[in-house]
Structure formats: structure tokens, C-alpha cells
């Protein structure tokens, strides 16, 4: 199963408490309805990021994806588009996001 990580930065002036409330009340709930997502959590970054102390990142998302093609379709769906609209219109500084997809190395 692929895992996508998204490292994010709040827009200037956005209250972290408001963003985290939106995560719990909206984002997590919508993610659970998308067929491609097996699990999704966002983690608050605490302390410096060694090697990138000035990056300004605040959160890292971990998204377990069942099927990448379906994931792209889910993001393009009305629910996915509304989620992304709210996320980037109200909370996150999109140009400062870093994301990558991984796959576990089997034993």
C-alpha cells in the first residue's frame, strides 16, 4: 500500500486551533468517505526540523492509499474539490507544501 506524506504550513494569521478543529470536524470525516483512503492522520510538528529549521512547516499528513488512480479520481470528485478548496482557501499556504508518495520495503 502506498503512503503519501504532505508537509504543510499554515497561512499567516491562521489560528492553529481553528485549523485543527476543521481537521477533526470536516477533513477527517470527508477522508473516511473516499474509497481510495485506507487511513489518514495529521500530526502537529513540534520543535525544530533538523536540517530544515527555517522551513516553517507546521504539520505532516500521513495518508494510506489503497489505489493511486482512485485517489486521483477522489480528489477530482466534488467532495475532494470542496475539501481542497476549503483547505487552501482558508488554512494552508499551498506553495510551501511538500509532498511525496512512498511504498514500504517488504521484509
Predicted regions and their residues:
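Macromolecular interaction modules
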Residues: 1-107
Amino acid at each position: 500500500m502506498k503512503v503519501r506524506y504532505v508537509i504543510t504550513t499554515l497561512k499567516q494569521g491562521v489560528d492553529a486551533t481553528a485549523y485543527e478543529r476543521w481537521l477533526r470536524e470536516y477533513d477527517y470525516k470527508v477522508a473516511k468517505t473516499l474509497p481510495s483512503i485506507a487511513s489518514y492522520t495529521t500530526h502537529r510538528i513540534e520543535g525544530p526540523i533538523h536540517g530544515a529549521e527555517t522551513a516553517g512547516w507546521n504539520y505532516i499528513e500521513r495518508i494510506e492509499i489503497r489505489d493511486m488512480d482512485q485517489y486521483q479520481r477522489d480528489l477530482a470528485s466534488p467532495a475532494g474539490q470542496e475539501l481542497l478548496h476549503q483547505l487552501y482557501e482558508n488554512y494552508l499556504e499551498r506553495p510551501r507544501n511538500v509532498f511525496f508518495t512512498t511504498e514500504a520495503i517488504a521484509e
